[in-house]
Amino acid sequence: MFGKGGLGNLMKQAQQMQEKMQKMQEEIAQLEVTGESGAGLIKVTINGAHNCRRVEIDPSLLEDDKEMLEDLVAAAFNDAARRIEETQKEKMASVSSGMQLPPGFKMPF
């Protein structure tokens, strides 16, 4: 089933990948990404754990209606969440790039 040293090599690769993934997850937790809405009038910054770190609202919006402001804040948060997800996928893809994974194999993240 496995060629000479194949199973040992596979186990070694799995261990290396596990170490890389742990390091990458630690790096991702430290990431901060800013999402925007309303052409940059609302900015929301979240970290890799999707915790909101900062909300910035342009003073000109404070005179507008409350519902629009709430919608813009939600849109900015969603933009930040999308950006952090993309960043996480890119970083995790780099971890698995050296492994010989079977076609269609999906990582557990």
From Swiss-Prot:
A single GO cellular-component term on record:
cytosol
Tagged with keyword DNA-binding: yes
Q: Name one GO molecular function term.
A: DNA binding
List the InterPro entries hit by this protein, alphabetically.
YbaB-like_sf, YbaB/EbfC
Taking the first listed entry, what is the main subcellular location of this protein, grouped into a coarse class? Answer: cytoplasm
Tell me the SUPFAM superfamilies matching this sequence.
Answer: YbaB-like (SSF82607)
* Highest taxon of source: Bacteria
Q: Which residues form a coiled coil?
A: none
Assembly state and interactors? Homodimer.
Q: What does this protein do?
A: Binds to DNA and alters its conformation. May be involved in regulation of gene expression, nucleoid organization and DNA protection.
Check the record and name the HAMAP family matching this protein: DNA_YbaB_EbfC
NCBIfam families (UniProt xref): DNA_YbaB_EbfC
Q: Which family does it belong to?
A: Belongs to the YbaB/EbfC family.
Protein name from the UniProt record: Nucleoid-associated protein YbaB
Name the source organism. Answer: Escherichia coli O8 (strain IAI1)
* Gene, per the UniProt record: ybaB
